[in-house]
Amino acid sequence: ADLDRFLYAPLARFTASGGKRTRPALCLLGCEAVGGEAARAMSAAAAIEVFQSAALIHDDIADKSELRRGEPCTYVTEGTGVAINIGDLGLTDVLGYVLRDQGLPADVRLAVMEKLLQMEERTIEGQALDLGWVRDGRWDILPEDYLYMASHKTAYYSAAIPLMAGAIVGGGTPEQLAALDGFGMAAGLAFQLQDD
């Protein structure tokens, strides 16, 4: 009962609490775009949504935000340490959703997990630059440095990887994956530029 109260229930509650679900929708669309059945990409879409939850829980702590989706942030209601742990669970769940999807062939699961791992790494790298520059009071950042940070922090996980993960499940060709990657990186970067 305590494990559920301190860990699983808060993550489930946060993930179900709203949001636009754009990233998992892009995953399903990526699958359909290459001729696949969207339902086959549900585990990848769920993995992307739980990553979003984990990233937002951690981001709220880093930014000292008070509200998320109109509600008190997880660290406000659960405490900082517990919230970090809840976010960490979300990060581990990312690969688990796909790993446990026995409806996908092993090679497809592996390829999707590789993309999801890339998504996690790039997003964390971008966040490290953003947080480090703010911490150090760096305002001498060149435009190309900002674009590198923004593409890593947002573009990979907001559009490029969701589209490619879905396309992998749908049996997309290397050319189709490359096209979705290019579109996704441009769309994700545009989202970050608008957000900033």
Where are these regions (language model features)?
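Mg2+-dependent prenyl diphosphate-binding active-site environment of isoprenoid biosynthetic enzymes
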Residues: 2-196
